């Protein structure tokens, strides 16, 4: 049975978030709000938790997981970022964009793409997500909370509680989130490639839905 934390969306209570972080440190999976949709998250260094994350989400190791980072400085510790890529990142962070980049040695091989050695990274613009990351002191491993066999992310914390209370260790309820996943941009090759149109406007990066 999961623990349920109801927090203020702009000024989350530190006491409750500290309890959620303790659960993450202990290897638990949590459902948390972000600026795009609710996400399933776990501690980056916990192998068993990462396997559980994939199992709950219903994806294999070829599905890009995402690192939620506090800022671009932290992101650059986990991905190889050149000057051109950094300028693009600055245009769209923080915000509902996920960038696929080549992972550094700081990223465990088991959570990066098995053949490409890439990883999704983003800097969310949500007070609760940022507060959790600050308390944890490192990125969270994440995936959009889309139930297996479905195409839309979950938005209602009560529905998440009903459907996932036996699967996740913690649910952080900050009210409804947007129902769109992030816009995914692949920066691991020569130029930016729009992989998925989501909540973030690709025009910020000079891209269109036809790119």
State where each predicted segment sits.
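Active-site-adjacent structural elements in enzyme catalytic cores
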Residues: 1-211
């Amino acid at each position: 049975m999961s623990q349920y934390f109801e927090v203020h969306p702009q000024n989350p209570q530190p006491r409750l978030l500290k309890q959620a972080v303790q659960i993450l440190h202990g290897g638990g999976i949590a459902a948390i709000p972000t600026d795009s949709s609710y996400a399933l998250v776990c501690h980056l260094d916990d192998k068993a938790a990462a396997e559980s994350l994939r199992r709950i989400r219903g994806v294999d190791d070829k599905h890009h997981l995402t690192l939620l980072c506090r800022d671009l400085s932290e992101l650059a510790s986990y991905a190889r970022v050149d000057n051109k890529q950094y300028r693009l990142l600055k245009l769209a962070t923080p915000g509902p964009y996920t960038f696929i980049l080549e992972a550094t040695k700081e990223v465990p091989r088991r959570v990066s793409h098995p053949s490409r050695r890439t990883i999704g990274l983003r800097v969310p613009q949500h007070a609760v997500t940022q507060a959790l990351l600050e308390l944890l002191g490192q990125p969270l491993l994440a995936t959009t909370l889309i139930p297996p066999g479905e195409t839309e992310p979950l938005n209602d914390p009560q529905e998440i509680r009903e459907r996932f209370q036996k699967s996740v260790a913690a649910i952080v309820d900050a009210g409804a989130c947007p129902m769109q996943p992030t816009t995914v941009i692949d920066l691991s090759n020569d130029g930016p490639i729009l992989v998925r149109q989501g909540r973030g406007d690709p025009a910020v990066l000079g891209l269109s839905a036809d790119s």
